[in-house]
């Protein structure tokens, strides 16, 4: 992708999301995240009316008179954005790729953070950590976050690639790209992407734990075409406030009728031809795709992790607003 094109897209996203933050998200962000934590300020002598539960018994024993611990509300948050930049993020069937939707979501989060004088950081990952930008404040920094997400998109030659070729690249992921085909163990017969561009969510979460000692609000943005990351996710959520954001495309649920497709078994090498025009194939594909998302959401919620589902072809703002309002209702209980 040309640098000129990246700049154009960043400016476009900045204009669109800037208005949305000002008009829609400003109050939602503050009501959900501000004041959700406290930090230690000082120890001072107890005075009548103080909460006895705040007494510091160690200091009281040493000084011979009661002292209390004083806490103040945390006035600054750190928002950590962890964005999956593996090959499947390039897929898009409705004029916008999952990567572009993720970039717009990153912009909404980054601009909401800097508007409230909070820091925002970014980690880009696939099977490895691609890039880490430490948390900072300021609009210039927020624009860099958006630019880096977009910069890991399609190359110039790929921008002109027909949609069918994009389907081939997407289906070539080691996990099958699409759950129904992945469970069958099939992939397209010719490899089209380097293996390093698969997704390893556990690697990203372990990296987060190593670089962030203080609690952060972490948005994990991915299509979650991975396995074996649940343990790392639960561990990260104990230390941080982790929010899982699934980015999907409508075609991941409704396979197009593109005729006969030759697939190869990833383990045996056996080639099989599938008729994508078959109503039965498309029906089973849709059912298993929906079941995958429902299962993912159940597992996350059972582990105490909030879940946001963003359709790359639709509004990015609406799911975020719904999440903020859900959090606000829960906070008031």
Please report, for each region that a protein language model flagged, where it lies by residue:
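A positional/architectural concept
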Residues: 33-37
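Exposed, interaction-prone extracellular/peripheral surfaces
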Residues: 1-29, 45-50, 59, 68-104, ...
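N-terminal low-complexity, intrinsically disordered segments
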Residues: 53-63
């Amino acid at each position: 992708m040309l640098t000129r094109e990246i700049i154009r897209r960043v400016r476009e996203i900045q204009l669109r999301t800037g208005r949305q933050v000002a008009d829609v998200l400003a109050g939602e962000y503050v009501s959900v995240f501000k004041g959700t934590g406290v930090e230690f300020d000082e120890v001072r002598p107890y005075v009548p009316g103080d909460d006895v539960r705040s007494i510091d018994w160690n200091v009281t024993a040493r000084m011979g008179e009661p002292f209390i611990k004083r806490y103040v509300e945390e006035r600054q948050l750190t928002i950590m954005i962890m964005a999956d930049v593996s090959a499947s993020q390039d897929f898009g069937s409705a004029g916008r790729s999952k990567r572009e939707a993720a970039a717009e979501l990153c912009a909404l989060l980054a601009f909401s953070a800097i508007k409230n004088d909070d820091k925002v950081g970014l980690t880009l990952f696939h099977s490895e950590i691609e890039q880490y930008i430490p948390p900072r404040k300021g609009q210039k920094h927020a624009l860099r976050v958006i630019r880096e997400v977009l910069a890991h998109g399609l190359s110039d030659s790929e921008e002109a690639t027909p949609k069918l070729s994009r389907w081939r690249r997407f289906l070539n992921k080691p996990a099958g790209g699409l759950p129904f085909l992945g469970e069958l163990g099939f992939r397209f017969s010719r490899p089209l992407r380097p293996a390093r561009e698969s997704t390893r969510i556990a690697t990203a979460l372990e990296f987060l734990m190593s670089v962030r000692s203080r609690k952060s609000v972490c948005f994990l943005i991915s299509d979650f075409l991975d396995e074996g990351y649940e343990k790392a996710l639960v561990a990260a959520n104990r230390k941080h406030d982790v929010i899982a954001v699934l980015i999907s495309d409508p075609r991941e649920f409704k396979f197009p009728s593109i005729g006969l497709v030759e697939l190869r078994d990833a383990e045996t090498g056996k080639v099989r031809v599938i008729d994508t025009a078959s109503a039965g194939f498309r029906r089973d594909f849709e059912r298993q795709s929906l079941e995958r998302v429902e299962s993912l959401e159940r597992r996350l919620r059972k582990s105490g992790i909030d879940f946001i589902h963003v359709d790359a072809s639709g509004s990015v703002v609406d799911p975020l607003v719904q999440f903020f309002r859900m959090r606000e209702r829960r906070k008031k209980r």
